[in-house]
A protein has these predicted regions:
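Glycine-rich phosphate-binding loops of nucleotide-dependent enzymes
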Residues: 2-247
Length: 247
């Protein structure tokens, strides 16, 4: 990994809220992560880029405690997360919005929204504020989760973690399979959350989308970070990204 991991960005003076050092992870006997190092500062949007199978999702799940077999260090506000339960990590204000969205098809939008408990100490986002971010949801409260479009399901998945009170959000491929107009709306929402002081770790293959909102990037390949750089360096990294992402 290059020195760009610590390059000065607008959020560079902010405190580091998440620090991952030497993170290794396994699924059964399959060794997936091979010493991942990354950091996220308060109020930043940081994006993990990489092809399918690079280890991006496993990195998020390892931070959240979903992957059982791990080694290395993951600290959140200087508190070690490895060894803590998923519930305990969530109570610290950390939330994961999974790629598969995990919307319950037989429950209404309202039931899905209120299903996870308010668990973070920071206090939940009000439903009124959620509906200003996602006005479509306020019009579909009684609709079944399975009747929502892909974009509406993604909005509901993000809204659900906001209502828990989490302030550190991990979003896994939030634009996957969505129409361009919905992708733009998701981008505006992430930018608004950043303005409100949320810290976001984003997994994306669509670096053109990420370029509009991310402060810094970490590029993964074969379970390792191979490069890290600030948004301002993106034009000079295009050749590397084309090779690393296959686009």
């Amino acid at each position: 990994m290059t020195e760009a991991a610590h390059v000065q960005t607008p959020a560079a003076a902010a405190a580091t809220v998440l620090k991952v050092e030497g993170l290794q992870a396994w699924y059964n006997e399959s060794h997936i992560l091979h010493g991942v190092d990354l950091d996220v500062r308060e109020g930043e949007v940081v994006t993990l880029l990489g092809r399918n199978g690079a280890g991006k999702t496993t990195t998020l799940k390892s931070i959240m405690g979903i992957v059982g077999k791990r080694s290395g260090s993951v600290t959140f506000h200087d508190r070690e997360l490895i060894g803590l339960s998923i519930d305990r990590i969530a109570r610290l204000g950390v939330a994961l919005c999974p790629e598969e969205r995990a919307i319950f098809a037989t429950l209404s939008v309202k039931e899905n929204l209120f299903l996870p408990p308010e668990i973070a100490r920071t206090g939940a986002m009000s439903v009124e504020r959620i509906f200003t971010l996602f006005p479509n949801l306020s019009e579909r409260l009684s609709s079944g989760g399975g009747k929502l479009s892909g974009g509406e399901q993604q909005m509901l998945a993000i809204a659900r973690i906001l209502r828990t009170g989490a302030r550190f959000l991990m979003l896994d491929e939030p634009t996957e399979g969505l129409a361009p107009v919905i992708i733009q709306q998701i981008g505006r929402t992430i930018a608004e959350l950043k303005r409100e002081g949320f810290t976001i770790l984003l997994v994306e293959q669509n670096f053109r989308f990420a370029a509009t909102i991310a402060d810094r990037f970490f590029v993964m390949e074969h379970g390792r970070i191979i490069d890290a750089f600030a948004n301002s360096e993106l034009p000079g990294k295009m050749d590397m990204l084309h090779e690393a992402l296959g686009v």
